[in-house]
Design a protein with these regions (language model features):
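Kelch-like beta-propeller repeat domains
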Residues: 1-180
Length: 180
């Protein structure tokens, strides 16, 4: 809620010991409704909302966490702009982020998003994010994404106080609508 702290801490879970160990905190203000994905043994956090006094605003910064060194590195800002409640997944050595809501949108800018972008962890600075076309689903925020055998599936979420039930899959090249 509005009166709660936004967090920037990171924890690692050891299944064999059933225990948690605190890792290095993100070196930025705490946030909520951010998304994360993992590629090549590193974790990535992007978008979300941060607090500024009693209000909050959406962000687009992207951070890489390296568990081998317990360090964070700033990467290119998410090319799709500020938002929270997006979707994220990784397939084929790339991270993907899309949809979400820019609660700061004004005028003719739509608050709800239906775009997707691919993150290349090996890309040169300034060119790590690239737009991905072909998604024909609804604009949404707080949807669900999962990956099975290098195919991403997305579904659910909300748009203008409407629950969404469309179901899509993405193989890294093509989007296909499945049965709702």
């Amino acid at each position: 809620g509005a009166n709660k702290d936004y967090l920037n801490d990171l924890w690692e879970y050891d299944m064999s010991r059933n225990s948690w160990t605190q890792c290095a905190d993100m070196p930025v203000a705490g946030r909520k409704a951010a998304v994360g994905f993992a590629v090549n043994g590193k974790g990535y956090i992007t978008t979300g909302s941060v607090k500024d006094g009693s209000s909050s605003y959406c962000v687009a910064d992207t951070w890489e966490y390296d568990p081998a060194t317990d360090t964070w590195t700033r990467k290119d800002d998410f090319k799709g702009g500020v938002r929270d409640g997006a979707l994220a997944f990784s397939i084929g050595g790339y991270g993907y982020v899309g949809t979400g809501c820019n609660s700061d949108a004004t005028g003719s800018e739509s608050a709800y998003k239906m775009d997707f972008y691919r993150f290349n962890p090996n890309g040169a600075e300034g060119s790590q994010w690239e737009a991905v076309s072909g998604y024909g689903g609804e604009k949404r925020y707080f949807g669900t994404a999962f990956v099975i055998d290098e195919v991403a599936y997305i579904c659910c979420g909300r748009n203008n106080n409407t629950d969404l039930v469309d179901f899509w899959k993405f193989d890294g090249s093509n989007w296909t609508q499945l049965r709702d």
